[in-house]
Amino acid sequence: MSEDGASKCQDSIQLIDEQKQFNEKTLEYFKRCIGERDVGLDYHVISVFGSQSSGKSTLLNALFNTKFDTMNAQVKRQQTTKGIWIAHTREVQTTANTGKGVDFFVLDVEGSDGAERGEDKDFERKAALFALATSEVLIVNMWEQQVGLYQGNNMGLLKTVFEVNLSLFGHKKDKQKILLLFVVRDFTGFTPLSSLQETLTNELQAMWSELNKPAGAEGSSLDDFFDFAFTGLSHKLFKPEEFASDVAKLGDKFTDLKREDYYLSGKYHQGLPLDGWSFYADSCWEQIENNKDLDLPTQQTLVANFKTEEIANNAFEHFSTAFSKLSSSLPGPELAASMKELKDQCTKEYDNYGSRYMKAVYLEKRGELLDKIKTKFSDAIAVHMSKLFNSLVSTFQSTVAQNAACQPLSERLKVGKERVMQVFEQETSDFVALELIPSVDADASALLEKIDELAERERGKEMKAIILRAKKYQFTHTRDDIVHLLSHPQDNVWQLVMDHFDDVFRRSVLKYKLPNLGDVTDESTAYDFQLDLIEEDNYALYLKIRSNAWTILYDIIHQYLKEDNVVSILRERFESKFRYDQNDVPRLWKNEEEVDAGFKVAREHALNMLNTLSIASCDGVEIVPDVPLASDEDEAQDEQGLYNEKRFGHILTAIQKEKIIQHFKRFANVAVVEAKRSTIKSHTHIPMWIYAIIAVLGWNEFMLVLRNPLFIALMLLIVGAAYTVHRLNLWTPLATFASAAVNETTHAVKAKLRTILLDDEHPKNASSKPVESFEMQDLSVNETKENANES
C-alpha cells in the first residue's frame, strides 16, 4: 500500500456514532487499509477506556501513530471523542524504531464521566460490553493522582466492565480472557509503580468480591477472566522526551514477541479473520443495542457460518467454472488427475480463508463443499463410467469374436474378461485412490454382471454350434453306412450297427475328450467342451449330444425299416440264397425236388432275418439308449431307470411282421413257379433222330458247299465274324442293330408301296364316278344321320 494510502488508513473513522449506529462502511475501510494483502488472523484489536479529556486519543496517536482527534486544552476542555472510533496502523512506536508489519486496529471509546452524557450510563455500559466482545487488550487510561479514588480512577467504569464480563463468560467453562492494561499518566515516580499496582489490584479484588455472580461462577476469581498489566507514562508536556521514551518502551511490549511481558498473547484473540471481524462487530453491537443477552460464542458461530459459507460459495463458483471446461472424454487417469487438481484448488482456496474461523464451523462447511464437489464429480464420473462400460462391453465382444476358429471359447472368454477388468482397473483406480469417489465396486459388479451375461450368451451360441456340428457329423457319417448295413443285413447286424454308432459318436466328440485319463471311464468327467462350464453343465452338454446321436440312429433305423423296405430286404436275401449258389453263380435247376429243397432253405434264410430286424438286440439283449431320446427327454424313467417310452429296440410289431410275411410269400411262390417252369423247358428238346434225317437229306447240299470255293470263303467269313462277335460279346448290340435295321427297312418299304397304290387309284377316281356309287354314298350318309338322330 502506498504511503498516501497508509496515511489515509491511519485517519480514523467513526465505528459507532453518538446515535449508536454501526458504520456499514467499516469493511470497505478495512479493505482500503489492507489492500491485496491476506491478513487472516494476523491482526490485533486494541481499545482504550478512561475518563473524558484524560488524554486517551493523545496516547493512541503517540503509541500507534494514529490520527484521532484530540482536545485543544488551550481553547476549551470538552468532549472530543463521540461514540467509538477506529483507526488502522502498522506503525507502532518502539525503542528501536517505528515497528512495522503487524496490523493494529485501535478503538478510541468515548470517555466516561462526561458532562455531555451526565447521568446517562447506558452508552457507557454498552461501549464497555462492545469493547470486551471485540478487543484483545483494553487500555484503562488514568492519571496518577486519581489512583485511590473511586470515580476519578474509573472504578465505576471498571465495575461495569466486570459485571459485563461476568454476564458474558461467567457461565462458560472456556472463559475468554482479556488483558486490562492500566496506563498511569503523568507518572512522576515518587510513588513506585508497584505500590500503585498493589493499590489498584486490592481495589479491583474488593470490587470483584462484592459483585453478584451468576450461577456457576460463585467461586470464580478475578484472574479467571482478566489478566492485568501496569505501566506509567511521564508527563507529556513537562517531560516530553521521557514521555516519548516511555511510549516507545510500551510499544516494545506490543511488537516484540520475544519479551516475557509481550501483551498480545494468542489467548486474547477472538479467532476471527479480519474479513469476518466487521460482520462480527456489527452483530455484537446489534445484540447490545437491542438489550439482548450477548452470547459471544453464538455470535462467533454466526460469523463463522456466514463467512465460511461465503468463502465456500466463492471457491465452488471458481471450481464450477474450471470444471465446465473439463472434457469428460479424457482417459480415466487423466480425468481423475484433472478432477483431483480442481478439487485441491477448491479446497485450498477454502482452507486458506475458512480455516481461520471456528474449527467446527469450518469443518462443517468444508464437508458441505466436498459434498457439492463430489456431486459434481459423481455426475461426470457417471458419464465417464457409462462410456467406459459401453466401450469395455464392445471390447469384450470383439475379443471373444477374435480367433474363434483356432482358440476355444473358454480361453477367449478368460482373455476377454481379464483384458476388460484390467482396463477397468486402470481407468477407475485413480478415482478411488484420489478420493474422488468412495468406491467403484458397484460399477465393477455391473460390468461383471454384463460380461457374465454376454459370456453366458456366447456359451449358449457355442453350445448350439457344438450340438449342431456333432449332430451334422453324426447324421452324415451314420445314415448311409447304417442303411447299407440294414439293406444287406448279416446275422450280427445290430452289433455292427452299434459298433459303427459308437465309433461315429466317439469321433464326433473326440476333440473334446480330455487326454491322459488312464483307466478313467467316467463320462461325466471325460470330456471338456472348453466353454468354461462347471462339471454338471459340461456333462449335461455331453448327454445332449449323445441324446441327439441316439435320436439320429433311432430315426434312421425306424424310417428305413418300414414294411416295404423290409420286404425288399427279405426278397433280396431270398433271391441271393435261392437263385445263386455259394459261389454267387446262377443256379440251373434240374428237377422240382431240387427247387423245393432250395426254396425251403432260402425261405428260412430270409424269414430268420425278419426276426432279427424286428427287434434291435445284441447277444439276445434288447438295445436300450443310455440317455433319453431328444423327443422324449421329459418322459419318466421306468423302474430300472431305462428310457424306453419310445422303445428304441422295438421296430416291427406283430401285425407288421404278418403283413411282411404275406408279401414275401407271394414273391417266393412266384419265384418257385418260375424255377419249376425252367426245369420243364430244359427237358423239352429236339430228338436226336431229327438231326440224322437232316444230315441224310441235306448231304448233297452240304457237299455242294464244300466243293465250291466261293461258298467256302463265304462260310469262313461268316464263321470268323460270328467268332469275333462272340468273343467281344457283341451279340446283343448286333441283334439290336439288326432289329432296328429290319424295322427301318420294313417301314420304308411300306411307305413306298402306299405311295404307289395311291398314285394308281387317283387317275381312276378323276376320270369317272358311277352313279351307283353316289347313291350308295348318299344312302350311307343318310343312314349315318338317322343313326345320329336316334342316338
From Swiss-Prot:
Q: Does the keyword Nucleotide-binding apply?
A: yes
Topological domains annotated Lumenal: 707-709
Q: Which UniProt keywords apply?
A: Endoplasmic reticulum, GTP-binding, Hydrolase, Membrane, Nucleotide-binding, Transmembrane, Transmembrane helix
Enzyme Commission code: 3.6.5.-
Spans within the Cytoplasmic topological domain: 1-685, 731-791
Any idea which GO molecular function terms this record carries? GTP binding; GTPase activity
**Which chain regions cross the lipid bilayer?**
686-706, 710-730
- Intracellular or extracellular location(s): Endoplasmic reticulum membrane
**Where is the segment annotated Disordered?**
763-791
Pfam families in the record = RHD3_GTPase (PF05879), Sey1_3HB (PF20428)
Q: What class of enzyme is it?
A: hydrolase
- Positions with a binding annotation for GTP: 50-57
Q: Which topology term describes how it sits in the membrane?
A: Multi-pass membrane protein
Example GO BP: endoplasmic reticulum membrane fusion
Tell me which GO cellular component terms the UniProt record holds. endoplasmic reticulum; endoplasmic reticulum membrane
Ubl conjugation keyword on record = no
| Domain GB1/RHD3-type G: residue ranges | 40-268
Give the protein family.
Belongs to the TRAFAC class dynamin-like GTPase superfamily. GB1/RHD3 GTPase family. RHD3 subfamily.
> What does the UniProt record say this protein does?
Cooperates with the reticulon proteins and tubule-shaping DP1 family proteins to generate and maintain the structure of the tubular endoplasmic reticulum network. Has GTPase activity, which is required for its function in ER organization.
Query: What protein name does the entry list?
Result: Protein SEY1
Source species: Eremothecium gossypii (strain ATCC 10895 / CBS 109.51 / FGSC 9923 / NRRL Y-1056) (Yeast)
The organism's lineage is: Eukaryota, Fungi, Dikarya, Ascomycota, Saccharomycotina
